[in-house]
């Protein structure tokens, strides 16, 4: 087990991210274990599933949506295998992987592979049903797919990538909004999309009032669907307060534990945590 007092003061990264914020907001001590001590993190087959679906979507979009579904699935399969093999290199015994319901670690790898294939198909099908929703092209001529961004919140730099920025019609006028592709069961809420929207407003002077998640669904679901969020209350100042709070926690090493049975169950570093709730 690891204790904060046993370590020397760490050198935090120079930038923040949505994922850093989310971890600190959920449990500062988890951030300490994951990002500072970098203890072993329990693998789960849903991680390569998500990575591979995102990669396949990116490849298809960059083809101008002309790549055949079979070729997109082949790209998915390649990315899935690479991601799984990388995780197996670190934790070759799948008995130590997360199980999912009745499926142990090994069985869940195969199950998640099949779920991801269906999600790739649903992703392509979604845009076949709504072809007017196209990827926004940035002023530099590049389509906004995996768009790298950086926002400065009074000295706190936030970096990351936006899955995609799409054009759509709002009140009979052309508008844009950030979209995140989700392979899990639940959307991630407003904060992530609000950060993306703020970047688009700061960098490109775009008016962005909403964002959404493209939910590729569970296995057996027929179609992907959209979950929208109104982002109008997320101002630059409000986001600045949140990121400055997270930055303060990290830089001043205020890694207080916040144990909770539900959170701890899905925490990949719970096995190294002295505060774990059962």
Segments from the language model and where they lie:
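Catalytic phosphate/metal-binding cores of nucleic-acid and nucleotide-processing enzymes, i.e., regions
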Residues: 24, 32-36, 139, 158, ...
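A non-catalytic, helix-rich entry segment at domain boundaries
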Residues: 56-147
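Charged, glycine-rich intrinsically disordered N-terminal tails and low-complexity linkers that flank
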Residues: 1-75, 79
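A short beta-strand motif that forms part of the nucleic acid-binding face
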Residues: 37, 181-185, 215-217
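Metal-dependent nuclease catalytic regions and adjoining charged, substrate-binding loops involved
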Residues: 5-6, 154, 188, 201-278
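An acidic intrinsically disordered interaction segment
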Residues: 7-26, 154-164, 232-240
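Charged, terminal alpha-helix-loop-beta segments
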Residues: 118-122, 142-148, 152, 262, ...
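Non-catalytic protein-protein interaction segments used by genome-maintenance enzymes to assemble
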Residues: 139, 144-198, 204
């Amino acid at each position: 087990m690891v204790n904060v007092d046993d370590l020397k003061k760490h050198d935090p990264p120079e930038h923040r991210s949505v994922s850093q914020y989310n971890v600190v907001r959920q449990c500062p001590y988890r951030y300490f274990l994951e990002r500072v001590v970098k203890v072993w993190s329990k693998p789960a087959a849903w991680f390569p599933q998500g990575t591979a679906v995102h990669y396949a979507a990116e490849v298809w979009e960059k083809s101008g949506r002309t790549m055949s579904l079979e070729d997109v699935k082949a790209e998915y399969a390649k990315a899935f295998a690479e991601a799984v093999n990388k995780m197996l290199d670190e934790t070759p015994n799948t008995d130590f992987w997360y199980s999912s319901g009745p499926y142990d670690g090994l069985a869940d790898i195969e199950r998640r592979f099949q779920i991801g294939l269906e999600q790739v198909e649903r992703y392509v099908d979604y845009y076949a049903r709504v072809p007017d929703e196209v990827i926004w092209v940035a002023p530099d001529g590049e389509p906004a797919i995996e768009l790298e961004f950086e926002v400065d919140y009074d000295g706190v730099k936030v970096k990351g990538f936006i899955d995609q920025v799409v054009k759509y019609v709002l009140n009979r006028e052309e508008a844009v909004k950030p979209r995140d592709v989700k392979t899990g069961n639940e959307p991630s809420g407003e904060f992530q999309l609000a950060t993306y929207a703020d970047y688009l407003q700061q960098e490109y002077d775009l008016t962005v009032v909403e964002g959404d998640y493209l939910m590729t669904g569970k296995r057996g679901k027929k179609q992907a669907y959209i979950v929208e969020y109104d982002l109008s209350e997320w101002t630059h100042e409000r986001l600045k307060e949140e990121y400055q709070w997270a930055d303060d926690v990290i830089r001043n090493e205020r890694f207080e534990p916040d144990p909770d049975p539900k959170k701890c169950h899905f925490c990949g570093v719970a096995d190294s945590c002295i505060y774990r709730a059962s």
